[in-house]
C-alpha cells in the first residue's frame, strides 16, 4: 500500500489464495478494496453509486457519456481504441439499478497500467 491510505480491514481470503484489504483514501475518503495474490490477471474497477431519481435511464446515459471524451481528452470512443491495441482480458462498463462500474483487466503489467 502507500501512505495516502489507511487500512480499515485486512483478512485472508482462502478461496483466492490471497489477502484482502479495505482501505480508505485519507484525502477523499474513497473506499478501496484490494485483493493481493499470485494471479497474473490484474483487475481494476472503479464504481459509483448512481441511484436513479426516475425511470428515464439517466445513469446508463451517463455511463456512455463518460466514455465520449472531453476537450482535455478528445477521444470519441476510448473502448474501441483500447481494444485495437490492448492485451486486455476484460474491458467493459456496466450500469446496475443503483451503481455504475468500469472494470478492466490484463495479464500484461504495462498494458494494465495503460487501461
Write out the residue ranges for each language-model feature.
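N- or domain-start disorder-to-order transition segments that initiate the globular core
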Residues: 1-41
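M16/MPP (pitrilysin/insulinase) zinc-metallopeptidase core fold and M16-derived inactive scaffolds
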Residues: 18, 36-114
Amino acid at each position: 500500500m502507500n501512505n495516502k491510505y489507511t487500512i480499515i480491514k485486512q483478512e485472508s481470503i482462502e478461496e483466492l489464495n490471497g489477502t484482502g484489504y479495505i482501505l480508505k483514501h485519507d484525502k477523499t475518503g474513497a473506499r478501496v478494496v484490494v485483493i493481493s495474490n499470485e494471479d497474473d490477471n490484474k483487475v481494476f474497477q472503479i464504481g459509483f453509486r448512481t441511484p436513479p431519481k426516475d425511470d428515464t435511464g439517466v445513469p446508463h446515459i451517463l455511463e456512455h457519456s463518460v466514455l465520449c471524451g472531453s476537450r482535455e481528452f478528445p477521444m470519441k470512443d476510448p473502448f474501441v481504441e483500447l481494444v485495437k491495441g490492448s492485451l486486455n482480458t476484460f474491458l467493459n462498463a456496466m450500469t446496475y439499478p443503483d451503481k455504475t462500474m468500469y472494470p478492466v483487466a490484463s495479464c500484461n503489467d504495462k498494458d494494465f497500467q495503460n487501461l
